[in-house]
């Protein structure tokens, strides 16, 4: 599903970021967002 990142999350490289939920490594209670357009643009956001 889609997700939008913001500056509050750890590992923010590009924010705000619109992309998809990636089952990557984020802290418990967070989910990873990955950009549709850039493989290096990702961040974690609170669930």
From Swiss-Prot:
GO terms for molecular function: sodium channel regulator activity; toxin activity. Disulfide bonds join 3-43, 5-33, 26-44. It comes from the Eukaryota. Keywords: Disulfide bond, Ion channel impairing toxin, Nematocyst, Neurotoxin, Secreted, Toxin, Voltage-gated sodium channel impairing toxin. GO terms for cellular component: extracellular region; nematocyst. One of its GO terms (biological process) is regulation of signal transduction. Coiled coil: none annotated. The keyword Disulfide bond applies. It holds the Pfam family Toxin_4. This is Delta-stichotoxin-Hcr1d. Binds to site 3 of voltage-gated sodium channels and inhibits the inactivation process. It is found in: Secreted; Nematocyst. It comes from Radianthus crispa. InterPro entries: Anenome_toxin, Myo_ane_neurotoxin_sf. Belongs to the sea anemone sodium channel inhibitory toxin family. Type II subfamily. A synonymy between H.magnifica and R.crispa is controversial.
């Amino acid at each position: 599903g889609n997700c939008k990142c913001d500056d509050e999350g750890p590992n923010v490289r590009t924010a705000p970021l619109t992309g998809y939920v990636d089952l990557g490594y984020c802290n418990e209670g967070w989910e990873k967002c990955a950009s549709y357009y850039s493989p290096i643009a990702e961040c974690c956001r609170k669930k």
